Structure formats: C-alpha cells, structure tokens
C-alpha cells in the first residue's frame, strides 16, 4: 500500500474503471489526462517513475493533503490507483483555464471586481489551510483553476504541501531534512527557538517541536528566505499571494516580464519596476495595490495574515460593487431619459404632420376661393397680397412635405417691460415661418431655401443622434474624456433679445421687398439673410467640478485677460460609416461674457453645440492654437522651388535617375568583387583564395564544435544539478552552482546568435563565392565542396542572393560584422568568465570531495564518453574551453588580415575585427591574472558559514596561510585562515551526503600524512601542486571504482566563530610546555593549540609575526580598534599608511626577513638559490630555537618587533595553490600564457564585476590607484591556497546524544 493512503478500499480505484482521454496539462512529475471514472468527468494525474523516492515523497504529501481537505475552493479528491504503467491520482475535473492562461488569452482586461473576487477566493482558501496548519508552498497562477460554471476558483497541485506545517509531534513521516540539529530542535512555546516559529499559520502559539523544512516551490513566486536557504514559516504563502496579486494588477508573468530577481539585492523586489509594468489607464484600487506590496515585504514579520487579507479584500469588493451599482443606475437613468426624449420627438413629429395636413387643406381652399374672386377695387390689394404670400408659404410647405423633412420646434418666451405697454415676443419656426408678436400676422414671412436646408440638416442630425446615442461606445467616450457639460441659458439677456428682434424685423422687410425683384436678386437676398441669420448668438454656461479642478479655469490657461476661447466638444451628430459609427469631435469659438473661478458664461454661434453636449477641453484662442490662417509672405525663389517640386513629371524623372545611379554603383561593386578573385597565372592569388576559404571553413566548423561542447556543459551538467536543487535533492547549493558554472549560459547565447548569423549569410555569394556569372566550372565545384565541408550536406544548393545596399548599415552581412558590432558584449562576458575561472576551479575541486557530486560527475562523463569517445567530456576540461576561445579567434583573424586583399569588400571589417579581438584577448589575460590574485579569498568566502552576507573581498587584503588546529583542553578541532589583516577562527562542519554520511569511521591518517608530506615539501621548496594532484588522482580512481562503500565524504564547510583583527594586541608563539604546540594570545582570550608537527608550528609563528609587523609598519600610529567585522582592518600590501613608502618593498629586506623567519625564497628564485637558502635556514632554525628559549621568552610584542625590525621586514609571500587542477586546465593556462607573451601590450588591469549566471555569486575586486594589490611577476604564477585537510580522528566522549551529533570533521583536499 502506498504511504499516505488509508487501509480501507474507499480511496482505492481500479485501473479498469478509468477511461483516458486527451492530455490537458504537463508538469514536473507527469502528465494530466482528461478522463472518466464511473460516469463522472475527472482529471487523472499520471506519475510514471513512482519508484523514485523523491516522487514517492511528494506524491505521499499530495495524497495526504487532498484526502482530508474538504473545501469548496479546493479540487475534490476521488482516490488513487497503482498500476504497472505508473501511479495515478484522480481528482475533480474543472471546465476552464488556469489563471495564467486566462490572463494571457483574455482580449480585454477583466474588471477589477472580478480580479478582486479571484484574490478573495484564494485568500479564503489559504485561511482555511493555515488554520489546519498546512503549508502549500507552491502558490502560483498555474495552480489556480477557474470554474466558469460556478464562477469560483479551485486550488490544485498539493505536491509541495506540508501537512502539519513545521510544527509537528513527530507523526509527519515525510520530512527529508536533518531534524537533529541543535539549533532547530527548540520548543516554540518554551521560549527557545527563533521568532519565526513562535506562531502557527492562523496566528496562534505553537506547542509542538520545530521541524526544519526543505527548499521547494517556483523561483519567481518564492520568498527571499527560501532562496537564501533560511528558516521560513507560514508567511511564504503570503509572499506568493502578493506576487499573484501583482500578476492580477499587471496581467504579466512575474519572473519573466518583470521582477526577474537575483541575489544582487538579496532576491528583493523593485517597486518602480512594478509601476512601469502596470497597463494604462492605471485605475487599480489603491487599497489592492498597497495590499499586494505589503504581502511582498522582504521581512516575513511585516507580511499580514490571511485573516487580515480577507477582511481588506472584502472591503475592497464592497466598494467596487457599490461603484458598479451606481454606474448601472446612471446608465438606466440615461436610457430612460433618451427614451422619453424619443417619445417626445415622436409626438412632436405627429403634431407637425397633422398641422401640415391642415395647412395644405387650408391652402388648397384659399387658392380655390381666391381664384373665384376677381380683383375689383384697390381695397382688396392687401388681402390679395397676403393671399399670395400665403400661397407661397403653402407651396413651400408642400415641398417640405414631399421631401419628408420635419422641422424642430423651439419656443423661447420672455417679457419685455416698456413705459407704456407690455408685449410678449415669441419666436417659432413651425411650418417654416418666422413669427414675431404672434398675435398679428403682419410679419409672417416664409423662410428662404438656404434656411430650409439648414433646418433639415439640424433636424436629421438630432433624430439620428437620438436613435444612436444609447450605444456603449458613446457612453464610454463621454465618461472617459469629458471635463464638463454645456448648458444653454433659458433666459437670454435683454440686449440679445432686442438684437434678435430687430434683426428678424429687418429680415422680414427685406424679404417682402426682394420677392418683387428678379430671380438674380433673389439669390443675393438668400445669401444675405442666411449670413444675417448666422449672426444670431446663444448664451451658455460651462461649470467645472471643484474637487477635480481646485484651481478652476487657471488649469486651462484662462484668466481675466482672455476674451475668446476654443471649445472642443463631442457633437451629437453621428457620422455613419460603412462598418461602424463614430462620434465626431468638433471645435468652435466662443466669446466670454462672464468668468468665475469654476464657471464661465459665454456666447456661441455654432448650432451643433446644444445643451447637454460633453465638453472635452477648453483652451485660449490665440496661445494654444497659433495655426489660425494668417497671411504668409512667400519669396519668388520659394515659389519657383515649389513649382519645380510639384511638377510630377520632373519629380518622377529625378527618382528614375537616382535608381539608375544606385543600380550602376551596385553592379560596379559586384564586378570589383569578382575581379579580386579571378584566377590569374600567379599561384599566389590562388593559394590565398584557397587559404581564405579554408580559414573561414575552419572558423565555422570550430564554432559548431564549440557550441556543441557548451551545450553539453549546460544540458548534461548544469541543468540536472539545478533540477536536483529544485526538487529538494541538491548536490550543490545555489552559490556553489553559480561559482562553478559562472556565466557559461550567457556565452552559449552569444554563440547561438553567431550560428544564426552563419546560417543566414551562408547562402550569400559574398560568403561562398558561388556566382551565376562565374563561367569557370572548376571554381563552382570547389565552392560546392567547400559548402559541403561546412554543413555536411552536398544536396544544399546555394543561390545568388544579392545584398540590400540600403540596409547594409543596419544589417549584419558577415561573421566579421557580427564580431565588430557585438565585441563589447563578448569582451564583457568572457572577461567575467576569465576573472572567475581560477575561483571556479577551486570550488569545483572542493565540491568533488563530496561523493554524491563526484559520482554524478563520473557518471555523466562515462555516458558522454560512450557517445563522444573522441572528445574531452570531463567537466573541468569543458569549463576550460572558453578561456582559449578568444585566442583561437585571434590566430584566425590575424591570418585573414594578412591574406585578404585591400579591395575586398570585407577587408575593413576583418581588419577592425582583428584589432578588437586583440584588445579583448589582452583584457581577458589581465582578468585571468587578477583571478589568481583574488580567487583564494573568494573561495574561502563560499566555504564559510557566517551569519551576515558580508564579503571577505577588500582592497589591500590577500591570503597568507591556513591550517588545522586542535585545542588542548577540549580536544576540539579548529581551522584558521590567516589573511593580511585579519585571522578567521572557524569550526569544520561536514557537508551532507545521502549515501555516505553514516560512515562514522573516517580514516584520516592518510590525510594527515599528506599534510606532513606537503609541509616537508614546503620547506624544500618543491612544487606543492604535485602532491595534491597525486592525492586527488588517487581519490578519483577510488571514486570511479565499482566499490562505492569505500567512498568518504571529505567536503567540509567552516562555521565562523571569531574574527581577530591583527591591528589589536595579538601574538602567536611556540608553547614551551608541549611539543608541536602554539600559544595564540588574543585581545580577550588565550588559545592553546596543537599542530601536526613542530615545523608547521614554527611556520605559523613566523608568518603570523611577519604579518603583524607589516601591519604595524603601514599603520605606525594606529592602534587596533575593537572591530571584529569581516570588513575591518585595512593593513596589507599597498595599505593606506601615513608614509608614502610603506607600499614599496626592498629586495634585500625580503631576503633578510626570509632568513630571520626560517622561510625559503619565493618560487620565482632558481634552484641553486633554493638549495643554498635551505642550508642557511637549517642553521638559523637552531639559532632561532635557542633565541626563542632564552632571549625572546617572556618578551612582548614591541620587543620582538624591534628585534625583527633591525633586520628589515617584508610582506609574507603569497604561496602557490595546492588546489588540484586537471591536466586540461593546466595546459589551457599554459597556452594562454604563451600567447600572451607573444602579444604583450600595455593593458590596464581594470577589474570587472563578476556577474555569473543565476544563481550566481558577485565579486567586485577593488583596483584603486592608491591601493593596488601587487600582481605576480609572471602571468602564470600561482598563489598557495591549500585545500583544508581532514582533522585528526581523536574522539572525545560525549555526555548526551545531542552533543554526539554536534561532532563534525573536516576535509578539503581530496578530489
């Protein structure tokens, strides 16, 4: 029975009852099918490799979590099925997309109410899970399914869920971590332990013991504490929820589109980057935005609990619902008003039709009666005239009825007080007649044709507007752009009314006179009347919202000095296009009558600007719109030029002439290119041509091979190690991964782009020289064979493709152009890799001391050897390939620059590429030298386990010595790192190994012997790397054997205990009470230590005294401060002292101090000097022993300093590295040194920041002008960095079980 499943058959499902359909998803652990189980649609998750313990562990957790969870927002669990084809989990099938695909596929951004509902559903789900002490640890948008039918979310994928959270009574058997660490086994309720673990997920105090949790989840949704491998609690789900909220806000993918986190800032987030990625318009609720940022707080204590999150989201949801209800009510009111307006208009139209019919009848009757009555006397002239006028009006009415156009009715009633009488003036446009003082028919006159047509246009526009104004597009435009609305004043001013009355009276009199004139005068009269009718002005008011515009009209640039303004408004006239309806944005001019702070009264003439129109913007008349037509003076020359340009014939002639010239230039260049490669009688040109083609073929073939090797490093080594790190079975931590592989992924991307360029330009005639105009069949055959050698396919036919000369400046047409345009990126990335190379080699050899990593590397190497037997498939060999790549480029382009003719099209590019590659090669060589200088401290920084993340790298600090010590009183093992200004006292801790960690009988005699032998070789001044190479080769042979039981985990970390600042009163001397013992006198404590032999004890004392003397020389007035931080202390070579000559070291002083302190000459000395110095040193050792027993015994630091100062002092020498380097690495470095000596130019050793691939480690070596660490005299000179050896296997009886678990041992030097 699978662990986690109940013994009853309730959760067991038979395989025959399952019906599999199509695949609906894929994940890290298997596929998900859509299926059927006993007539119910289900989702079937297949786990094929169920025998793997990791898969079993996570499957057991998922089953255990789903079996007991019953929540409407969690997928329902039906059961599990075990079969030969794999293990299957059967859950509820959700008809819908996951949240990630939904946000990606939605055509329009979803409403904020729906987004808040999704977030609220997730928060309620996690509030329930945390109340049951269950951590999900994999909250992301892909694990949230949207149930469309029920309009709710469903949470799935409980593979990383932790039942019982980190607080358990021991019943959770799924823990894969070491639970016996004394720092983690503390009762949360009892007060011991970290503050992180005092409460459960629901905020209540925890009562059970603490359990360390593993590292799992999706990196883009993981909080910083998980990525930094620190302790974490329930707040990790809150951080993931905050990332999910930002995804709902931006509708983009975190970790890809924004917030690509790195360890530069401790995996923190950037708020400015979030603000940039929010789509416009940014109408996100402020409370929702603040909640997302608060959940993404860097400190876990600042993140809220899900109970608080649910409360905030419910308040946001309530506000959004109220807002939407108000909008819906406003829309309903607008629709009702529109309907009422339409009904009123329909009634008015019906009334107008009835009136027209009555008038037609009356006109017909009056015409018949007038025709029957003869004209007898003059008294009836007025009536006849009136009848004629009325007949004219009836004719006009008949024409209106035939055209089916109905006029609008607008009535304005005002009272005009006078001294004698009170008259009522009404103005109507009914029946196309202008009536003044409606009680009398004296001034009844028909409208002109122009006025009738204008009224028809207005009426038709209003009718069309009323029929289409209810569309959603119009409402959205009104609500989104309008600043105010225009309201027409019902009561016009007295002056306006008088002006209108007088104008209308004059119009009526003129019309009566003009009717008796000819038809030519009638047209002039219509134009005058229409122009005068346009002079009728209307008054209106525009008011601003005081809350939106507190400064009033000043925000629009309008003040008391402004007389006229431009009014930009949304016209109610609808422009009906062929496909859609578009609102018109129009602009008119208005005169200011009265100006207040938030309101403006103006007069307008535009008839389209009616009451209720939306005002989009208001601007000053002259300031903001200077494009008003003004007279422009044009010179005669300008007029002539315009005439020439506007002449189409001459313009076409110029275009044809230019095209002919461009074509002639291209053909000429092509012929010159052909002539450069014509076969001549001389063998020199033919040999150069063949050599040119052969070099390019060699360059492309080597590029393909190099790219294949980089892919092997990434796919065979890097990706499997990263995948094991993600599934909680790490071979290395993220710092070690970044240290070993550096930025090799960036290098692979650069060469991938280069291969794309090669494939694109491979068909170009300028690249292969396969021309159609070439008549030499033999040359065509040679070119075809050349392409076959490059791409391995003789069937490929290369055609003649001409190069576009217009885009030649922006298009990359050759390999040399790619290198020239991308040389800065190549220089940067290869410089980073070279700076980290030595440091990467140290970390790789240290990590191979772990059997798990060693077996993994050997297994991958054996698999690659079977596939590629002719290549070097070892990881160390593959990592050394990029170091020589630029040197290979340099050799190829140096030869190409010599044999390429000057008239060749690529000659300039090849020449410039050669120059840039040479500069890049020198720069990489300088970075490689600096890597030897700083690699030791960088390696120590990775091996240390310290509380803070402060780096050891500092200007003027270098490595001196390291070694193992045993404390006499407690028999504890310590490890010391002596640097130029500080001393690190550490405690070794064995790394974890899944298969070989239980081997308690660690044989350390061999390691001690190696330590002794290496110490003796140091005194004899032999190559220290040979002994280490022999020991690592033996270790490799043991690791590659079939007997894995003999493997020993020799990889140790170093927990930092104390940092001793050498500026303080510290000293080290021989312990006279015991052999091989030293006394380390610190500022607060005296240590009694034991070393493996007497010679090593003397070496430690001498190196320590020289270091302290050098610090005193550089800082003669500076007493040590009580600063024990890693960055404390500034002494060392090139340190900042008061004397300008402190950084200079005399060679005689170096020799004297070496003789006094029993130390050999540095490695740069010859063998003869070494033998002589050894004989001298043997005599001085006896004298120094006597002096130590007699003279210096009991003397303080100042006396010993004076004794040494009389003979001169110098810095302790930097020793060669004892880290094992593979033969390929050594050979590659030797090749680089030989090439560098040939191409030695003046290069500034400018350090660059080490930017490695993610996960990565960053080091920034300091290169000050005043404080420059001295580089070695030779390019390939190495410094001594010994791999720490295994401590002695002296055991001490422990009183308790927990204290036995604290026993740690250390090793370093076996590969």
Curated annotation (Swiss-Prot):
Domain IQ: start-end pairs: 650-679
Gene Ontology terms describing biological process: signal transduction
Limits of the DH domain: 691-927
Main EC class the enzyme belongs to: transferase
Keywords: ATP-binding, GTPase activation, Kinase, Magnesium, Metal-binding, Nucleotide-binding, Serine/threonine-protein kinase, Transferase
EC number(s) recorded for this UniProt protein: 2.7.11.1
Regions crossing the membrane: none
Binding site for ATP: 24-32, 45
Biased composition regions of type Gly residues, renumbered to the chain: 1117-1137
Sequence ranges of Low complexity compositional bias: 451-471, 994-1021, 1031-1044, 1230-1245, 1263-1276
Ranges of Polar residues composition bias in the record: 1208-1229, 1246-1257, 1277-1287
Gene3D superfamilies in the cross-refs: Dbl homology (DH) domain, Phosphorylase Kinase, domain 1, Pleckstrin-homology domain (PH domain)/Phosphotyrosine-binding domain (PTB), Transferase(Phosphotransferase) domain 1
Pfam families: IQ, PK_Tyr_Ser-Thr, RhoGEF
Family recorded in the similarity comment: Belongs to the protein kinase superfamily. TKL Ser/Thr protein kinase family.
Protein name: Kinase and exchange factor for Rac A
Organism: Dictyostelium discoideum
Taxonomy of the source species: Eukaryota, Amoebozoa, Evosea, Eumycetozoa, Dictyostelia
Gene name for this UniProt entry: kxcA
């Amino acid at each position: 029975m699978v662990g986690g499943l109940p013994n009853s058959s309730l959760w067991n499902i038979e395989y025959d009852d399952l019906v599999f359909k199509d695949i609906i998803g894929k994940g890290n652990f298997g596929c998900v099918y859509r299926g059927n189980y006993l007539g119910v649609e289900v989702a079937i998750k297949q786990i094929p490799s169920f025998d793997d313990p990791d898969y079993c562990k996570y499957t057991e957790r998922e089953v255990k979590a789903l079996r007991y969870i019953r929540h409407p927002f969690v997928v329902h669990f039906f059961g599990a099925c075990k079969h030969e084809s794999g293990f299957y989990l059967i859950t509820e099938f959700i008809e819908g997309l996951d949240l990630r695909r939904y946000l990606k596929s939605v055509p329009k951004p979803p409403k904020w109410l729906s987004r808040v509902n999704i977030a609220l559903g997730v928060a309620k789900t996690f509030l329930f899970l945390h109340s049951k002490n269950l951590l999900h640890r994999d909250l992301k948008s892909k694990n949230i399914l949207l149930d469309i039918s029920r309009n709710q979310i469903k949470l799935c994928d409980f593979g990383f869920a932790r039942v019982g959270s980190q607080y358990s009574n021991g019943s959770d058997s799924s823990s894969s971590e070491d639970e016996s660490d004394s720092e983690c086994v503390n009762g949360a309720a009892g007060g011991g332990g970290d503050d992180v673990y005092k409460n459960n997920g629901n905020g209540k105090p925890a009562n059970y013991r603490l359990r360390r949790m593993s590292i799992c989840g999706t990196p883009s949704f993981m909080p910083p504490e998980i990525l930094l491998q620190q302790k974490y609690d329930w707040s990790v789900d809150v951080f993931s929820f905050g990332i999910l909220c930002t995804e709902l806000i931006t509708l983009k993918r975190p970790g890809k589109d924004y917030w690509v986190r790195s360890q530069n800032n401790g995996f923190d987030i950037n708020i400015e980057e979030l603000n940039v990625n929010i789509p416009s318009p940014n109408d996100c609720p402020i409370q929702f935005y603040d909640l997302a940022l608060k959940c993404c707080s860097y400190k876990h204590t600042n993140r809220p609990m899900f109970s608080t999150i649910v409360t905030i989201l419910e308040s946001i949801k309530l506000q959004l619902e109220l807002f939407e209800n108000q909008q819906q009510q406003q829309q309903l009111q607008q629709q009702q008003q529109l309907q009422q307006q339409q009904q009123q208009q329909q009634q008015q139209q019906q009334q107008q039709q009835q009136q027209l019919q009555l008038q037609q009848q009356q006109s017909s009757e009056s015409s018949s009666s007038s025709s029957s009555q003869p004209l007898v006397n003059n008294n009836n002239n007025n009536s006849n005239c009136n009848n004629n006028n009325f007949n004219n009006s009836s004719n006009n009415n008949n024409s209106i009825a035939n055209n089916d156009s109905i006029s609008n009715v607008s009535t304005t009633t005002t009272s005009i007080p006078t001294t004698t009488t009170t008259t009522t003036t009404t103005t109507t446009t009914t029946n196309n007649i202008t009536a003044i003082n409606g009680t009398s028919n004296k001034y009844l006159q028909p409208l002109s044709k122009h006025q009738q047509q204008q009224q028809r246009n207005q009426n038709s526009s209003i009718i069309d507007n009323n029929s289409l104004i209810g569309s959603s597009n119009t409402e959205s435009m009104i609500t989104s752009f309008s600043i105010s609305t225009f309201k027409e004043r019902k009561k016009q001013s007295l002056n306006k009314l008088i002006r209108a009355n007088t104008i209308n009276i004059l119009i009526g009199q003129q019309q009566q006179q003009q009717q008796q004139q000819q038809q030519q005068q009638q047209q002039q009269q219509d134009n005058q009347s229409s122009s005068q009718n346009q002079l009728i002005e209307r008054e209106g008011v525009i008011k601003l919202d005081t809350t939106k515009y507190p400064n009033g009209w000043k925000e629009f640039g309008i003040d008391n000095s402004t007389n006229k303004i431009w009014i930009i408004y949304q016209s109610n006239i609808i422009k009906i296009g062929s496909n859609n309806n578009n609102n018109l944005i129009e602009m008119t001019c208005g005169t200011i009558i009265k100006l207040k702070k938030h309101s403006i009264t103006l007069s307008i003439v535009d008839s389209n600007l009616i009451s209720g129109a939306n005002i989009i913007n208001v601007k000053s008349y002259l300031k903001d719109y200077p494009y008003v037509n003004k007279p422009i003076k044009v010179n005669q020359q300008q007029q002539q030029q315009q005439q020439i340009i506007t002449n189409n014939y001459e313009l076409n002639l110029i275009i044809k002439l230019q095209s002919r010239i461009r074509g002639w230039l291209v053909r000429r260049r092509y012929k010159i290119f052909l002539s450069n490669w014509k076969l001549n009688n001389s063998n020199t040109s033919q040999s150069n041509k063949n050599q040119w083609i052969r070099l390019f073929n060699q360059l492309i073939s080597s590029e393909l091979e190099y790219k294949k090797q980089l892919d092997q490093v990434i796919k065979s080594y890097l990706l499997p190690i990263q995948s094991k790190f993600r599934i909680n079975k790490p071979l290395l931590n993220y710092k070690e991964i970044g240290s070993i592989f550096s930025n090799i992924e960036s290098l692979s991307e650069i060469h991938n782009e280069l291969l794309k360029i090669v494939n694109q330009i491979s068909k170009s005639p300028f690249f292969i020289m396969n021309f159609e105009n070439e008549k030499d069949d033999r040359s065509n055959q040679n070119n075809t064979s050349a392409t076959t050698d490059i791409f391995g396919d003789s069937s490929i036919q290369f055609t003649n493709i001409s190069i576009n000369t217009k885009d030649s400046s922006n298009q990359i047409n050759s390999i040399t152009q790619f290198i020239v345009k991308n040389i800065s990126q190549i220089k940067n990335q290869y410089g980073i890799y070279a700076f980290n190379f030595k440091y990467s080699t140290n970390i790789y050899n240290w990590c191979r001391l772990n059997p798990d990593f060693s077996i993994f590397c050997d297994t991958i190497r054996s698999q690659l050897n079977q596939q590629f037997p002719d290549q070097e498939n070892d990881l160390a060999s593959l990592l050394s390939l990029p170091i020589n790549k630029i040197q290979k480029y340099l050799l190829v382009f140096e030869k190409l620059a010599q044999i390429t003719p000057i008239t060749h099209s690529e000659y300039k590019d090849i020449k410039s590429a050669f120059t840039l590659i040479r500069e890049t090669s020198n720069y990489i060589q300088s970075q490689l030298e600096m890597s030897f200088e700083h690699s030791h401290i960088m390696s120590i920084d990775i091996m240390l386990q310290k509380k803070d993340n402060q780096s050891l790298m500092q200007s003027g600090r270098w490595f001196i010595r390291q070694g193992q010590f045993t404390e006499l009183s407690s028999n504890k093992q310590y490890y010391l790192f002596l640097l130029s200004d500080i001393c690190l006292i550490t405690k070794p801790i064995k790394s974890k190994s899944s298969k070989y960690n239980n081997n308690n009988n660690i044989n350390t005699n061999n390691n001690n012997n190696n330590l002794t032998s290496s110490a003796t070789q140091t005194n004899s001044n032999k190559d220290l790397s040979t002994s280490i190479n022999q020991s690592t080769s033996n270790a490799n042979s043991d690791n590659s054997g079939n007997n894995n039981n003999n493997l020993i985990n020799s990889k140790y970390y170093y927990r930092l205990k104390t940092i001793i600042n050498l500026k303080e009163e510290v000293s080290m001397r021989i312990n006279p009470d015991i052999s091989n013992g030293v006394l380390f006198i610190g500022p607060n404590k005296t240590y009694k230590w034991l070393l493996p032999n007497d010679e090593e004890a003397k070496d430690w004392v001498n190196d320590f005294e020289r270091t302290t003397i050098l610090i005193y020389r550089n800082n003669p007035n500076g007493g040590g401060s009580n600063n024990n931080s890693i960055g404390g202390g500034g002494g060392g070579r090139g340190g900042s002292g008061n004397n300008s000559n402190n950084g200079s070291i005399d060679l005689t002083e170096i020799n004297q101090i070496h003789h006094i302190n029993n130390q050999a000459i540095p490695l740069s000395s010859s063998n003869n000097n070494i033998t002589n110095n050894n004989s001298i040193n043997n005599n001085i050792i006896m004298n120094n022993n006597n002096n130590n027993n007699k003279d210096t015994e009991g003397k303080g630091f100042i006396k010993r300093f004076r004794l040494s100062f009389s003979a001169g002092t110098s810095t302790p020498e930097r020793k060669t590295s004892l880290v094992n380097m593979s033969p390929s690495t050594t050979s590659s470095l030797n090749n680089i040194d030989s090439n560098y000596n040939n191409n030695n130019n003046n290069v500034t050793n400018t350090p660059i920041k080490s930017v490695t691939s993610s996960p990565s480690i960053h080091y920034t070596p300091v290169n000050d002008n005043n404080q420059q660490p001295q580089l070695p005299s030779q390019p390939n000179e190495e410094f001594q960095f010994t791999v720490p050896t295994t401590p002695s296997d002296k055991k001490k009886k422990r009183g308790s079980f927990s204290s036995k678990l604290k026993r740690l041992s250390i090793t370093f030097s076996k590969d």
